């Protein structure tokens, strides 16, 4: 199943709600991800531009997009960024295909 990096930044309202009532939001979102056929592989809270970082497996880009839209529509997030990930073997295969594409950069 494809892997995705999801980076989530909470809105001010989202942080206010979490400070008022601290809770494990990873466990709160797990059922929604699983309902779409996905699985949380790992999750962390983070400092910086994004507050939560997830590595998830989702059946397809459509499913990964659906959960990102659901997160964004909930109102607690100011940003949701989803990045498709390649395994090392997939990346090597992509490199081999790139070599065979005969693409030439402009001179």
Predicted ranges, named:
Residues 1-107:
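A compositional/biophysical signature of low hydrophobicity enriched in polar/charged and small residues
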């Amino acid at each position: 199943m494809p892997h995705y990096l999801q980076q989530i930044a909470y809105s001010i309202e989202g942080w206010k709600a979490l400070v008022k009532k601290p809770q494990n939001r990873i466990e709160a979102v797990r059922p929604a991800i699983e309902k779409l056929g996905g699985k949380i592989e790992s999750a962390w809270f983070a400092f910086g531009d994004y507050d939560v970082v997830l590595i998830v497996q989702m059946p397809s880009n459509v499913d990964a997009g659906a959960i990102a839209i659901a997160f964004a529509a909930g109102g607690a997030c100011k940003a949701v960024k989803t990045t498709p990930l390649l395994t090392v073997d997939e990346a090597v295969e992509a490199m081999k295909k790139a070599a065979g594409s005969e693409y030439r950069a402009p001179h």
